[in-house]
From Swiss-Prot:
Protein name as catalogued: Cytochrome b
Entry binding sites for heme b b562: 83, 182
Record-annotated disulphide pairs: none
Source organism superkingdom: Eukaryota
């Protein structure tokens, strides 16, 4: 008798995706992050669902409803901080996953890569609208500053901003619609993630060498399920340590002050995972220029497959490209640091130089290094 998992219409889909999936035998722990992102998404949806049961999306009660969750709801504080720090873990996994894709040339699976960029943008949008919901000072001013950027669009900008606000300032209507967006977007992310997997399973996984591995495949289960479980345990352990020992480590103290339109915080800054993009935005003195640079800092990922000049897919055997890749990582860390600093000397110039280097590395230096390495292959 044939196994039910191979014949049942639903089980067959799961079997082909998680059990009998042929997987390269040499993929490293850098390939763990896909499943960890799935785990993060499930955790965020579940904790978010329980928070939504007690939260009220109204300017007069939003802040106190979050306080009520933390004080009066059974384990409400735990659910709230799991959700807040879960977002940080989500972005750590997301950036590691993208970094892996860049290093090993996974971006050559173009459909999978483009869906991935779309996923990144959707997750960033979800995190942004979610940060507005507690209705603290940083929530309010973050929403005001970031939505205001759209006013830089010529002709329709101001109308667009007022349309998003649902009025002439960030107010009740804005909070209500942001809650609606924050509730629906994770389900859109889930659907996109399914399409992401669908496209990935059309080609099969890449591997560290970047060489086709069709002649050496092993089943996903038990080899990689056990490896994914180890990764999941490490992720959960880190998240629990963060949540139970230092829940506010990555948050902003200003968000414990209720939103006040009449008092601007000294330093308006987003959560840590947006600081690199915020630094690029601030490094250009022109509003429209800054907005375009901000958009391009993420959308540049779409152009990476077109900028592949090397004959080798992976950076595993390309020392010049490796050096530039790690320079890019250092540059992104520098931008993250700058994004959290006040706008004054020497941070302004450091931010501008780091922003120039970011685009220079991706658009010019890395493709050039690929060409040089091609020449070296002939020696």
């Amino acid at each position: 008798m044939t196994n039910i998992r191979k014949t049942h219409p639903l089980m067959k889909i799961l079997n082909d995706a998680f059990i009998d999936l042929p997987t390269p035998s040499n993929i490293s722990s850098w390939w763990n992050f896909g499943s960890l992102l799935g785990l993060c998404l499930i955790m965020q949806i579940l904790t978010g669902l329980f928070l939504a049961m007690h939260y009220t999306p109204d300017t007069s009660t939003a802040f106190s409803s979050v306080a009520h969750i933390c004080r009066d709801v059974n384990y409400g504080w735990f659910i709230r901080y799991l959700h807040a720090n879960g977002a940080s873990m989500f972005f750590i996994c997301l950036y590691a996953h993208i970094g892996r894709g860049l290093y090993y040339g996974s971006y050559m699976f173009q459909e999978t890569w483009n869906i991935g960029v779309l996923l990144l943008l959707t997750v960033m949008a979800t995190a942004f609208v979610g940060y507005v919901l507690p209705w603290g000072q940083m929530s309010f001013w973050g929403a005001t500053v970031i939505t205001n950027l759209l006013s830089a669009i010529p002709y329709i900008g101001t109308t667009l901003v007022e349309w998003i606000w649902g009025g002439f300032s960030v107010d009740k209507a804005t909070l209500t619609r942001f809650f609606a967006f924050h509730f629906i977007l994770p389900f859109i992310i889930t659907a996109l993630a399914a399409v992401h997997l669908l496209f990935l399973h059309e080609t099969g996984s890449n591997n560290p060498t970047g060489i086709p591995s069709n002649m050496d495949m092993i089943p996903f289960h038990p080899y990689y399920t056990i490896k994914d479980i180890l990764g999941a345990l490490l992720l959960i352990l880190t998240l629990l340590a963060l949540t139970l020992f230092t829940p506010d480590l990555l948050g902003d103290p200003d968000n414990y002050t209720p939103a006040n339109p009449l008092s601007t915080p000294a330093h308006i800054k987003p959560e840590w995972y947006f600081l690199f993009a915020y630094a690029i935005l601030r490094s250009i003195p022109n509003k429209l220029g800054g907005v375009l640079a901000l958009l391009l800092s993420i959308l540049v990922l779409i152009f990476i497959p077109m900028l592949q000049t090397s004959k080798q897919r992976s950076m595993m055997f390309r020392p010049f490209s490796q050096l530039l890749f790690w320079t890019l990582i250092a540059d992104l860390l520098t931008l993250t640091w700058i994004g959290g600093q006040p706008v004054e000397h020497p941070y302004i110039i450091v931010g501008q130089l780091a922003s120039i280097l970011y685009f220079l590395l991706i658009l010019v230096l890395m493709p050039t290094a690929g060409l040089i390495e091609n020449k070296l292959l002939k020696w």
